[in-house]
């Protein structure tokens, strides 16, 4: 009997007439509540079972979810996309979750369908707040939290990524020769946005290499906050652009003092991970100049808000870091390698990093575990191709060991910090999104 019923279910067909309409007593569309052009249909052998047949791009029980929407207009009251985390990366609760059913806005309201609420956890704005939101579980309570989805009006790119000083973000003078296993030494012309940050030493001795960074505008370098947490004074550091060899003069290099050092106000560290690991350095030469474009000095493009390259994409990492954790000395030449982005689901597996990973981080690794960012690479760039141009997707942050199996490098996810960057840099010329 069970086998017969299962076979019958498999053979159930939606029957339509020659004009595309459903037959066999198909119900009025109002009985299904289909939206966005969805059609209410019934099955050949189970005519009382009704559902919405959704047009392409639309999903959900009532075709109420628009999978193509990645941003919102106005205050987002009409947003029907699939964003489902708050601004800190915490997952939203489903609108039909038991705890949410006790809240004013839930999937069981009579007007739930018109408000976009249903058997899902996607962000909505049913009560006309400033932007889409959701309920988030924090401890034992549920809170209303704004969502990690951006305003469409802020996502429009400028017609050109060339600023008034002649920079063109993401442009290289040389074509790299990718060699994944172990990486390869490279000229800075392959990574002209790379910034070498040195810590000054007492007694007049030469400064020591501290961390990498990335030139995101003529006057600003992005790096990792953990590089500076022990000595957070700007006077302790000097920055070089256009440098292929550490502590050596390079033709075309420029030296800068740090005019301003900004660490993320919510930076913290635990037993393994760094959180909100991002810093900004405002740079000036001794004569008050910002960076000048050349073959060896160029800005890197910033990603669109909350947008990253697909998982599995090849990305470049660059730095003066150690080649293995056991090395005593750092290499003197700039080195570049290629790694692949690892999905959050994979990186959150217990045998990877588990709960140490959140949605403000990116993971990347060599599939053969032979290449990785290592000690000394901190603050340097993870460059991925987004919409056809090299983009600063990540900042080298932390990881367990170097090229250790199932322990990818972890990077600050730049696309989730653009509002923070812009709030400090303001209308600075040359910031290329």
Curated annotation (Swiss-Prot):
UniProt KW Phosphoprotein keyword: yes
Chain positions covered by the region annotation Binds urokinase plasminogen activator surface receptor: 35-58
Activity regulation statement: Inhibited by SERPINA5. Inhibited by SERPINE1.
Protein keywords: Disulfide bond, EGF-like domain, Hydrolase, Kringle, Phosphoprotein, Plasminogen activation, Protease, Secreted, Serine protease, Signal, Zymogen
Modified residues (Phosphoserine): 159
Enzyme Commission (EC) number: 3.4.21.73
Chief site of localization: secreted
Residues in EGF-like domain copies: 28-64
Domain Peptidase S1: 180-426
SMART domains: KR (SM00130), Tryp_SPc (SM00020)
PTM (free text): Produced as an inactive single-chain protein (pro-uPA or sc-uPA), is processed into the active disulfide-linked two-chain form of PLAU/uPA by a proteolytic event mediated, at least, by TMPRSS4.
One Pfam family it belongs to: Kringle
Signal sequence segment: 1-20
Domain Kringle positions: 71-152
Subcellular localization(s) per the UniProt record: Secreted
InterPro entries: EGF-like_dom, Kringle, Kringle-like, Kringle_CS, Kringle_sf, Peptidase_S1_PA, Peptidase_S1_PA_chymotrypsin, Peptidase_S1A
Family according to the record: Belongs to the peptidase S1 family.
Subunit structure, as described in the record: Found in high and low molecular mass forms. Each consists of two chains, A and B. The high molecular mass form contains a long chain A which is cleaved to yield a short chain A. Forms heterodimer with SERPINA5. Binds LRP1B; binding is followed by internalization and degradation. Interacts with MRC2. Interacts with PLAUR. In complex with SERPINE1, interacts with PLAUR/uPAR. Interacts with SORL1 and LRP1, either alone or in complex with SERPINE1; these interactions are abolished in the presence of LRPAP1/RAP. The ternary complex composed of PLAUR-PLAU-PAI1 also interacts with SORLA.
Function of the molecule: Specifically cleaves the zymogen plasminogen to form the active enzyme plasmin.
Designated name of the protein: Urokinase-type plasminogen activator
Organism: Mus musculus
Gene name of this polypeptide: Plau
């Amino acid at each position: 009997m069970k086998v017969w019923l299962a076979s019958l279910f498999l053979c159930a067909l939606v029957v339509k007439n020659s004009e595309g309409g459903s037959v066999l007593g198909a119900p009025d569309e109002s009985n299904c509540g289909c939206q966005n052009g969805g059609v209410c249909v019934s099955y050949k052998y189970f005519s009382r079972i009704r559902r919405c047949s959704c047009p392409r791009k639309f999903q959900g029980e009532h075709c109420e979810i628009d999978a193509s929407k990645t941003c919102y207009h106005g205050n987002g009251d009409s947003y029907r996309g699939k964003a489902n985390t708050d601004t800190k990366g915490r997952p939203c609760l489903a609108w039909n979750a038991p705890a949410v059913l006790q809240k004013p806005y839930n999937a069981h309201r009579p007007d739930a369908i018109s408000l976009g609420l249903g058997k899902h956890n996607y962000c909505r704005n049913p009560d006309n707040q400033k932007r889409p939101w959701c309920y988030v579980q924090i401890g034992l309570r549920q809170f209303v939290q704004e969502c990690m989805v951006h305003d469409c009006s802020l996502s429009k790119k400028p017609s050109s990524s060339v600023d008034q000083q002649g920079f063109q973000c993401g442009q290289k003078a040389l074509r790299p020769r990718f060699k994944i296993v172990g990486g390869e030494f490279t000229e800075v012309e392959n990574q002209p946005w790379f910034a070498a940050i040195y810590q000054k030493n007492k007694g007049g001795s030469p400064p020591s290499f501290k961390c990498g960074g990335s030139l995101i505008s003529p006057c600003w370098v992005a790096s990792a906050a953990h590089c500076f947490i022990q000595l957070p004074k700007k006077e302790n550091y000097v920055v070089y652009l256009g440098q292929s060899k550490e502590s050596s003069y390079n033709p075309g290099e420029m030296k800068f003092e740090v005019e301003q050092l900004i660490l993320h106000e919510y930076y913290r560290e635990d037993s393994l991970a760094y959180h909100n690991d991002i810093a900004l350095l405002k740079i000036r030469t001794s004569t008050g100049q910002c960076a000048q474009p050349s073959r060896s000095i160029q800005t890197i493009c910033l990603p669109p808000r909350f947008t990253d390259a697909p998982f599995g994409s090849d990305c470049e990492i660059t730095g003066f870091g150690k080649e293995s954790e056991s090395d005593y000395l750092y290499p003197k030449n700039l080195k570049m390698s290629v790694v692949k982005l690892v999905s959050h689901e994979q990186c959150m597996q217990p045998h990877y990093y588990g709960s140490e990973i959140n949605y403000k981080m990116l993971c990347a690794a060599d599939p053969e575990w032979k290449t990785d960012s290592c000690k000394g690479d901190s603050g340097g760039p993870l460059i991925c191709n987004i919409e056809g141009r090299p983009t600063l997707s990540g900042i080298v942050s932390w990881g367990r060991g170097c090229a250790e199996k199932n322990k990818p490098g972890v990077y600050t996810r730049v696309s989730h910090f653009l509002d923070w960057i812009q709030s400090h840099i303001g209308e600075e010329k040359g910031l290329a999104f």
